[in-house]
Amino acid sequence: GLGDVYKRQVPLIVDNTFATPINCRPFEWGADIVVHSTTKYMDGHAGAIGGAIVDSGSFDWTKHPDKYPGLCTPDESYHGVTYTERFGLAGAYITKATVQLMRDLGAIQSPQSAYYLNLGLESLHVRMKRHCENAQRVAEFLQQHENVSWVQYCGLPGDKYYELGQKYLPHGSCGVVSFGVKGGRAAAEAVMGRLKIASIETHVADSHTCCLHPASTTHRQMNAEELLAAGVREDLIRYSCGLEDAEDLIADLDQALQ
């Protein structure tokens, strides 16, 4: 829990890509730093690759200078500045992340990509509501389908994360549903091949519905034992609901599962 994090004297960093700030605000639950892949819902249209780091400025790095020498001792590669002294707790981490990532990796968006991202952010609150509504309906449909062996979506009562979802994500989680197809790997691959609306891709969290069979794509080099250890079942399909009409998505899934 959160207490264990602080006992170990480390900041709590939360990846809020799927929930977005619309559905979850980690700082209100004790997080110190939040990260996002803005390529996903924030952009929403697969138009611009990007990421974001948001620092609450709440973690006291100076209490544990031995653990964080990069923030608490002079940085000889940047004019000998000590970030905690120069920028305080509110600016030490994010300043170091900004200046060093830009300098060493060129981690800054082009003006055109930033423009696309800003356009996406304008409609984020509208899109997230639709993504969540579609995912809830799709998950409920899959839960009742005779050819589906299991469904994981925290909006479903009975899901092992349902109570946590209600606590941290009261307005919905995201549009991504995971489910298993009866018949294992071969059956899951067959379902993927019959889908007509969803595109098969590793991308996720987009305005267009997309899906993935990890065992035969991203994790295809693993054997059955390694897949299980990685938490990837051979019957698993990851289905990312877009903004299409839920009835169309359900009809497409229904015909693919027959």
Placement of each model-derived feature along the sequence:
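Short, small-residue-biased leader/transition segments that mark boundaries at the very start
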Residues: 1-6
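Short, surface-exposed connector motifs at secondary-structure boundaries
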Residues: 7-10, 123
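Conserved PLP phosphate-binding loop immediately N-terminal to the Schiff-base lysine helix
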Residues: 10-44
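Buried hydrophobic positions in well-ordered alpha/beta secondary-structure cores of metabolic enzymes
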Residues: 12-15, 26, 51, 131, ...
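Active-site beta-loop-alpha junctions enriched in small/polar residues
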Residues: 17-19, 156, 242-244
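Residue-level recognition of oxygen-bearing side chains
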Residues: 22, 47, 248
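Active-site C-terminal subdomain of aminotransferase-like
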Residues: 33-36, 42-176, 180-210
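PLP-dependent enzyme catalytic core of the Aspartate aminotransferase-like
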Residues: 127, 186, 193-194, 209-258
